A protein has these predicted regions:
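Acidic, glycine-enriched loop/beta-strand segments at the rims
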Residues: 27-36, 41, 87-90, 100-134
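Active-site neighborhoods of metal-dependent hydrolases
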Residues: 1-85
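Cofactor-binding beta-sheet edge motifs in enzyme active sites
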Residues: 69-73, 170-173, 178
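Mid-to-C-terminal alpha-helical segments outside catalytic/metal-binding sites
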Residues: 94-98, 117-118, 156-158
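Feature captures the catalytic cores and cofactor-binding loops of soluble hydro-lyases/lyases
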Residues: 67, 71-85, 92-94, 124-136, ...
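A generic secondary-structure signal for well-formed alpha-helical elements
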Residues: 10-15, 81, 99, 103, ...
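Short, well-structured alpha-helical segments that form the helix of a local strand-helix-strand
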Residues: 1-7, 87-96, 111
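C-terminal cap of metal-dependent C-N hydrolases
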Residues: 43-50, 55, 121-175
Length: 179
């Protein structure tokens, strides 16, 4: 039979159980899973020119939750995957430095004097995604998927702490980026 990745079973099981009040979901991926594993995705992520990123700009917030992608890269691909993994430092560089360069944000993506100092301090051993939940917090009660993560100790934007242990500090040093 086809052997599928452990993460698929974990997603189907979820962590809300009977107490999620109908807010859970079942997601059945079919792309890049034809052989019952994610080896094709590993090959793509391993390519030296690959810049991993995923977003649809919020167009389908009631069906998918792409905001979990960076955490998935670090937990599944660097730490937990059974089989070939990817080095954490390569994934962080790809998500920070390589992505910033690709979109012309040359003052971000690495730590150096004079740069913005946008930093995530992560406890990689505690890093985990929680099961997606349906929330109704958009205008007119519109729904979207929310997926929380644990293990982010602090987030700094322009050197100021904006989140500590998942709680917003109230600091808003960010600014709108225009192309």
């Amino acid at each position: 039979g086809v052997v599928y990745e452990v993460v698929a079973a974990e997603w189907l099981r979820g962590d809300g159980g009977a107490t999620d009040r109908g807010g859970g979901m079942i997601y059945v991926p079919f792309l890049n899973f034809a052989d019952g594993d994610l080896d094709a995705v590993h090959a793509m992520l391993s390519h030296p020119d690959a810049i991993p990123g995923l977003s649809d700009g919020g167009a389908h917030v009631g069906m998918i939750c792409d905001g979990s992608f960076p955490t998935t890269l670090m937990t599944h691909w660097a730490r937990d995957r059974v089989g070939a993994r990817l080095p954490l430092e390569r994934l962080v560089k790809a998500q920070a430095h390589d992505t910033a360069r690709a979109v012309g944000l040359h003052d971000r993506g690495r730590l150096a004097p004079g740069l913005r100092a946008d930093i995530n301090l992560i406890d990689t051993s505690a890093l985990r995604l929680h099961a997606p939940q349906v929330v109704h917090d958009l205008p007119a009660g519109g729904r979207r998927l929310m997926q929380r993560a644990s293990g982010y100790v602090a987030t700094l934007v322009a050197g100021r702490v904006t989140y500590r242990d998942g709680v917003a500090t109230g600091a808003l040093p960010g600014r709108l980026v225009r192309s």
